[in-house]
Structures are given as C-alpha cells and as structure tokens.
Swiss-Prot record:
Belongs to the TtcA family. Its EC number is 2.8.1.-. CDD domains: TtcA-like (cd24138). GO terms for molecular function: 4 iron, 4 sulfur cluster binding; ATP binding; magnesium ion binding; sulfurtransferase activity; tRNA binding. Pathway: tRNA modification. It comes from the Bacteria. This is tRNA-cytidine(32) 2-sulfurtransferase. Its cofactor is Mg(2+); [4Fe-4S] cluster. One of its GO terms (biological process) is tRNA thio-modification. NCBIfam families: PRK10696.1 (NF007972). Catalyzes the ATP-dependent 2-thiolation of cytidine in position 32 of tRNA, to form 2-thiocytidine (s(2)C32). The sulfur atoms are provided by the cysteine/cysteine desulfurase (IscS) system. Binds 1 [4Fe-4S] cluster per subunit. The cluster is chelated by three Cys residues, the fourth Fe has a free coordination site that may bind a sulfur atom transferred from the persulfide of IscS.
Length: 381
C-alpha cells in the first residue's frame, strides 16, 4: 500500500463548497507558468507566479481581506516556496505531516502550505497532527475545533510526556531539551504509522539563528537547525518550510488571521531561559542594525571549511605545496650573500640597506612635533 493510499483511507475531512470547487478545477487552471512556483531560475519569476496564484485564489479570497494582508501573505507564500524549492522539501506524491502545536508558527506553516497545495504544479497531501502532551490546563478542544472548522484532515495524538519531563528534569533546569526529544520520538513513530513521507515543523529563520548562537555560546559548536534533516535511523525526513521567514512577519500574519493561539505552559512559564536571552539579543541587533540578521543567516549558507579549524570537516593534515622546484632561482632556502646582483639582473626589486625609522621625533628648529613622510621601501624578495 502506498503512502498516498494509506493517507486517503485513514482521513475523512470535511470541506466547504468553495474548497471543493477549487480542488475540482485545480488541474484545469494549472498552466506552465504556475510551474514556476518551484522553478530554479535566478529571478524566480515572482511576478508571473503571483499573477497565476492570484487567479487561482481569487474565487476563495474574501473581499474583506485588506491589501496589507494580501501583500504579507504573498511575501510568506514566496519565501516558503523558495525554501521548498531550494532544499527540495516537498516532491510529487508526498504526504506531508504538519505538526501543529497551537502556536503562531505552526498555524502559519499549515495555512501557507495549504495555500501552496492549491497552486503547486505537483500533487501532495497534507495532514495536521497535534501532540497532546497532557499539560495541566491545556485547552484540548481548541485545536480540533479550529481544524474541523477549516476542513483540515488531522489527528490528535495523546501522550503524557509532561509527567515524564517533570520527573526526569531536575528542579531549576529547563525542560526544552527533554520535551523536544520525547515529542520528536512520538511524532517520528506516528509519521510512519500514517505513511507520512515528510514531517513539517514550524521553525522559522529566527529560530535557526537563535539555535546557532545557543550552540556557539553554550555548546562550543557551529551548528543550527537545518532546513531539511534525515533522522538518524533514516526512517523520517524533517522539513522546515519557514526557514526563510522572519518571526515578526509570522507574528503579524497570526494577528491578522486571528489564530486561536495556545500558550506553552510547560517551558513557556520558565524564567531565565537561555533561548529567551538569545532572542532578546537578536531583537536588539535587528532594531539597531536591520541587515545584521540577514547577513548572519546568509553566512550560515556560505560556509568555508578551509577557513575554520574543524579537522573532521577539512583535511589540514595532508595539505602540501604544489610548487615546482625547477622554478627556484637559487639553491637553498634563502637568498645568500652575493646573489643580490643576480636578482637585479632579472628585473626583480632589490631591498635597500636596512633603514630604521622613528616617527615620534621632534623638529628641533620649530620645537614641535612635525609629521614626516615615511620613505618608500621596496619589498624584500
């Protein structure tokens, strides 16, 4: 049984009439120009892609949507499609399991992916999965109500990881690491059960930058969150389609969409988290130097192993000269006495006798410090 077949049999989502009409007419509306959503041309043909996307989405867009909202949505749509294309995140026939926590990031991810699914030149399925970790006070009815209202196929996976985290993490320590590992393990196993070929997480560009600095400052490593990751057992593929998206745009998008946000009462209530400190630092940088974060993120995509000091990443031990000894002018390692004339004969510059120059001297005639021109000295060969 293929992943797509398994997915179809296990989900029975409800759709409104507008969604059905849009899906029925999808292939009729798809043109060659729409394929530029995943085109790898340098200019990305954004205007053409947006024109076609606007035509497809026109029949379902609300007249009350402001131009400001549509502009922001278009920006996110572009950035997510670029990330999908650049890292080959989603392929034809994929079943994408979107992990929805109830936070702004995962809501935005799900919303944009559903939007792209309707205009993409390839076919892929989306299923939303929420992991109910049994945190005290967790409003377990919020997400199912929202997903049902939107007609989105979904699962609610119930696992009491909260009690485990509380029991194994010492008092005063952060829960994030243990919680993340337990959550990841649960989602990995469930993805295989439903035949999902990709697991989409809602981490954005600023999450990746914060993780980079956390590892740099506290872990002694140059590493972050990759946009695409194969699990250690090679059984699951993680993707982060929001890799190019800034958090401030997600905050604004979630506000305009009025997503029913569910706060994290497990780690969100802890104080003095190192990640929170790093996030504050990044926000201060962004306010004072608007291009700094973009430059740092660009650097993460432009690594020069030979310019660092990781012996596992670059083979420094076997570095050797590739010089032709026949090109040497003289025998021995250094120019010997009596060979200066030979240098002059072949036109190479010859250094004058050693000169001692001290710029901090006083002009005795004027009794004041007078700058003197530094004499030109030919380079020593």
């Amino acid at each position: 049984m293929t992943a797509a077949t398994l997915f179809t049999q296990q989900t029975t989502p409800q759709f409104d009439k507008a969604s059905i009409d849009t899906d029925v007419n999808h292939h009729a509306k798809t043109t060659a120009i729409e394929a530029m959503l995943y085109d790898d041309s340098d200019d990305r043909n954004d205007d053409f892609m947006d024109e076609q996307a606007d035509k497809i989405l026109a029949d379902t867009q609300s007249l009350t949507e402001s131009a400001y909202f549509r502009k922001l949505q278009k920006k996110l749509r572009r950035q997510v499609s670029w990330a999908i294309r650049d890292f080959n995140m989603i392929e034809d026939g994929d079943v994408v399991m979107v992990c929805v926590s109830g936070g702004k990031d995962s809501y935005t991810l799900l919303d944009i992916l559903l939007l792209l699914k309707r205009i993409a030149p390839i076919h892929f399925d989306i299923v939303a999965v929420n992991l109910d970790q049994k945190q005290p006070g967790y409003p377990e009815e919020v997400l199912p109500a929202y997903l049902n209202e939107q007609g989105i196929a979904h699962y609610i996976l119930e696992k009491d990881t909260y009690s485990i985290v509380k029991s194994v993490v010492p008092e005063g320590k952060t829960y994030c690491s243990a919680c993340s590992r337990l959550r990841r393990g649960s989602l990995y196993g469930f993805a295989k059960q439903i035949g999902a070929t990709k697991i989409a997480l809602g981490h954005h560009r600023d999450d990746m930058l914060a993780t980079f600095f956390l590892n740099l400052f506290h872990g002694g490593a140059l590493k972050s969150m990759p946009p695409k990751l194969l699990s250690d057992d090679k059984q699951n593929m993680l993707i982060r389609p929001l890799a190019y998206v800034e958090e401030k745009d997600i905050i604004e998008y979630a506000r305009l969409k009025e997503f029913p946000i569910i706060p994290c009462n497990l780690c969100g209530s802890q104080t003095n988290l190192q990640r929170a400190i790093i996030n504050d630092m990044l926000r201060e940088w962004d306010d004072a130097h608007p291009q700094r974060l973009a430059s740092i993120f660009k650097a993460m995509q432009n690594v020069a192993p030979s310019q660092l000091a990781d012996r596992e990443l670059f083979d420094f031990e076997t570095l050797s000269l590739e010089r032709d000894d026949n090109e040497r002018l003289f025998e021995g390692d250094n120019i010997q006495a009596g060979q200066i004339e030979s240098l002059a004969e072949i036109g190479l510059p010859v250094a004058p006798a050693t000169q001692i120059f001290n710029p901090n001297f006083v002009d005795t005639e004027k009794g004041s410090h007078t700058p003197k021109k530094i004499p030109t000295i030919n380079p020593v060969i």
